[in-house]
Amino acid sequence: MALLMFAIMRQMNIIATINKNTAFFYWLQTVSKWDTSYAFEHPLFTYYHQVIQPADNLILSQVSTIIQSDPNPYDILRKLYGGEFDDEKSRLIAHISTPLIDRFDSIWQDCNENLDVWRDVINDFSYNDLYMQLQKIAVFLGLEKQAIKDNVIFLLPPRLKVSSPAGHKISSSDFILLRPPYSFNDQKKEAVRIVMLHEYAHGLIQQSKLFQEAGRLSYETLILPKKLIAPAGYTWRSVYNELLAYCIASRTIGGYLNPQLTGKPCPTIDDMRLSFERLLAKRRPTSNQIINWASLHMLPKLTDYIEEGKLIDAAIFEPAIKVVDELRKS
């Protein structure tokens, strides 16, 4: 009986916190412009960069060079964000960037009160209705149910203008980075919660050896023979990661957790077909839109796998890769 009560009581939580050092190093890597892939957001760069003076460019160039020189640049960022200055490169970046802290202070002052409010809002969220679904996802990925653990979120400075929430989950990190929107309403709160669970899903995916095996087999079977090119700004590794994470939680297609996150059923392909076809008629969709649309096509199979307790395999990705291939031909 006691064990049953413990199982019922055991839940998970995501705790938001504010850390100026984490926010500073996120701002620093953005204005250094070391990465211009899909992760780069020009409007955010413009806002963050407004406080930079010409004399600062040498420091930014040095920071960019150090990050780019590492075989695993995101590991350097993980250490900087987490306050782990245990290697030469992270210590060097921390040292040479010290003069820029005063520049960052004006950005920090703009958003500090806003982040305080978002921290309280996020820490009021409950995840009791998601716990069992997340455990099912863990099993699907070949993980133990105990993989569903509490997580820490570091809040990052948002743009002052209208913007959408964005998150990051670096592999091997024990935290999530979240940049909330500046404004508040129920719709924004829902969007933030979805982004948080999307990034939480990335954390589970990063732990899954079965995901790596399924993605590799799918890549060797469906991508290599046709020499398919990944959507602009993405590698195929990142595409496979995003396909699965969007299937779990997405502001665009809902995902497996949509009923718990929004109280609404997941949109179907037919529900979204007309809007996507209109988009195609106007212009070429962005890489993010392509991946979301492709992900929607694998959602029914993923849902069946999860509900039936099946393990992830390469077949999960077939519907999505087929869509990407068809869009390439069109």
Indicate where each model-derived feature is located.
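N-terminal low-structure segments adjacent to metalloprotease catalytic domains
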Residues: 1-106
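Active-site scaffold of zinc-dependent metalloenzymes
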Residues: 78-79, 152-155, 159-190
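Auxiliary, metal-adjacent structural segments of Zn-dependent hydrolase domains
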Residues: 110-171
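Soluble non-cytosolic domains of exported or imported proteins
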Residues: 124-131, 187, 191, 195, ...
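An active-site-proximal "capping" alpha-helix that borders the catalytic cofactor pocket
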Residues: 137-140, 239-254
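Active-site recognition of the HExxH zinc-binding catalytic motif
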Residues: 190-211
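Post-HEXXH active-site segment of zinc metalloproteases
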Residues: 207-237
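Pan-zinc metallopeptidase signature
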Residues: 249-253, 257-330
